């Protein structure tokens, strides 16, 4: 994932539902392997993690245009995160949005929310197996 403790990223298109928020920081969380994606000028934050932490074979088929929008050409620039839903009573019910991952160019500090074209992924993928 991201190495530094807290890094600011520009999201020129914002995040779906939060299009007016263009700047976020990503910082470590006390709940590993999760991080916090926090807006710098609004009280909005998301819990995020790499989908590969719980689904090693994740293949979202991100459109090349999405990577181009954040100027990510090389594989070592690209990071994929997913938003986590923890508003549950039991940790086994925690879900991840695999349908609309956050993609980041970690060298240019740009990000966007992409739409995954692989139909097998959903907005509410269970993170923990029972």
Curated annotation (Swiss-Prot):
Family assignment from sequence similarity: Belongs to the FliW family.
Subunit structure: Interacts with translational regulator CsrA and flagellin(s).
Listed name of the protein: Flagellar assembly factor FliW
PANTHER family, per database record: FLAGELLAR ASSEMBLY FACTOR FLIW
Gene this chain is encoded by: fliW
Listed GO biological process terms: bacterial-type flagellum assembly; regulation of translation
Role according to the record: Acts as an anti-CsrA protein, binds CsrA and prevents it from repressing translation of its target genes, one of which is flagellin. Binds to flagellin and participates in the assembly of the flagellum.
Primary localization: cytoplasm
Location(s) in or outside the cell: Cytoplasm
Coiled coil: none
GO cellular component, one term: cytoplasm
Keywords associated with the record: Bacterial flagellum biogenesis, Chaperone, Cytoplasm, Translation regulation
UniProt xrefs under HAMAP family: FliW
Organism encoding this protein: Borreliella burgdorferi (strain ZS7)
